[in-house]
Amino acid sequence: LLFLMGASTGAAYAVANPGVTGVKITQQNGACTGVVVDATGETVIGASVIVKGTTNGTITGLDGDFSLSNVKKGDIIQISFVGYQTVEIPWNGQPMNVTLQDDTQTLGEVVVTALGIKREKKALGYAMQEVKGDALLEARETNLANALTGKVSGVQIIRSSNGPGGSSKIQLRGANSVTGLNQPLIVVDGVPMDNFTGASNNDIDNPTLDMGNGLSDINAEDIESMSVLKGASAAALYGSRAGNGVILITTKKGTKREGLGITISGSVSAETTFMLPKRQKTFGQGENGVFDSTNGYSWGPEVTGQSYTKWDGTTANMQIFDNVKNFFDTGVNLSESISFQQQYDKTSIYTSLNRMDDSSMIPGANLSRTNLTLRASSTFGKDDRWSIDAKVQYINTLAENRPISGARGNNAFYTIFNMPTTIDIRDFSSPVKDEYGEMIWWSKGGINPYWSKDYNPNKDSRNRFLMNGSLKYKFTDWLDAEIKAGSDMYFTEGEEKLYAGSPTNNKNSRYSTSEKKFFENNFSFLISGHKDELFGKFGGNFSFGGNLMERKSTGLDNAMGKLTAPDLFSLANGDKKDL
């Protein structure tokens, strides 16, 4: 049971109406001069003064003064400074006295902070940045984590190369632990979410399949905003597991406008290889300048188009092939969404359905995801002091032929990068097996990546439920209390097959299954207050709350290393069990 309590104070600001003061009438010849002050009359040092549409500019000095030469009458003078409204004034030849007003939109910007509390950004005592939902839709990323790339300072996104839906790693302000566990806590609508959904061991030598992380389950269309909390304050609010920071996700609610609103959207995107590894294109297969059709190196004779005998005994003219480029396809991502928003008096309802299909650049690798969301919120009671909010979200993810990680022969990337450059990978695309049912490949080691697609396939499915509900009561305009409950649960099933004829299992086949069950329940209460001008111009806020978390995870892996009847994939068909 974790109890949290905190308080902070700060100045309450009174902001005058925006405007610009007048201009002294004293003729100057081609030099625009003046003074810049704020609403209190204090000089503004370092304000930018520029002729709009040009590079002719300067900054104000210690007394807020400036002098700008080569200015024509009628030119627009633009004055700006952080935290103030930008001013544009046409110059009529006289010195300028300019008053900058506070940018009330920036100072009064309300953001969603820890535990779902809304605060003015200026009053926060810790670093945080917010990204609006529209900005996350610009690139239409399969994994939501990738959409943060370049949008938040100090956030490093390490993208996965493991096909569609692969995990992406997030680090806030560098590495905080030598163990490598540096990822922030993910919180959706005030409820923590598990960002690790598991990996699976493949059949041959147990390399790993990346089955994606929690953020890859979230539909970007449902997001209102994402906030990034950095520093120790995140740990103070969410406990030790938030020591690496927190990413807060706020999802959409129904509109407050009367009537029914329908939004339909769709997108199509394509992906292809951008940067390919560079390999030497002078020498062919072999070593020490000598050709050898069984050698895996590319330091044989110089390639001049000479005739040679290939791995299959046929004769051809030697040439260099770009196997990396020739292996990958053009990936296509399709996404369709529809959402309904309905307002009934004081109750709003939001429903959305999204379908995403991703055909990877990797031949045979595919991912599909379906998101269904239902959310309702309402206010009731005297003066609408009571408010209730509830949401249920279901996500189904299906994947086929996720690429295998590790420096293993059944890793397509590893195989292609280590092939001799005078062997064409496309020669093995069809057929992939001979008349004896064995795999066609140029050497006795490694696996034909086209064979893996059909005869060493893997697939997995994940069903996830995200649920939360809250009840809030507002005692006064500055004091309220809230209780909240949330649950994150998912069920993952995986299957891997190895057909007879593979070089590591020529006579028999292999079959394995895996399953994982996970749930986390959170129950919390929070009493919070915020009041401006509590002591003169000073205001303050406080919060007191607690959280009870219940978490459980179970898993089961089964493997049949030698099937009695080849290619009959059943756990009952085998005489050897690898558990």
Please place each PLM-identified region on the residue numbering:
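Residues embedded in well-ordered regular secondary structure
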Residues: 130, 151, 163-168, 178-184, ...
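Short, acidic Ser/Thr/Gly-rich low-complexity loop/linker segments typical of extracellular
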Residues: 55-65
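N-terminal periplasmic accessory domains that precede
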Residues: 94-99, 109, 144-146, 170-173, ...
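Flexible loop and strand-edge segments within Gram-negative outer membrane beta-barrel domains
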Residues: 273, 314-354, 358-365, 371-445, ...
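Short, acidic, small-residue-rich periplasmic hinge/interaction motif at the N-terminus
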Residues: 14-52, 76-85, 92-137, 145, ...
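Membrane-embedded beta-strands of outer-membrane beta-barrel proteins
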Residues: 66, 170, 247, 338, ...
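Short, polar/charged loop or turn motifs at beta-strand boundaries
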Residues: 35-39, 127-150, 158-162, 170-177, ...
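Membrane-spanning beta-strand positions in outer-membrane beta-barrel proteins
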Residues: 76, 156, 224, 259-263, ...
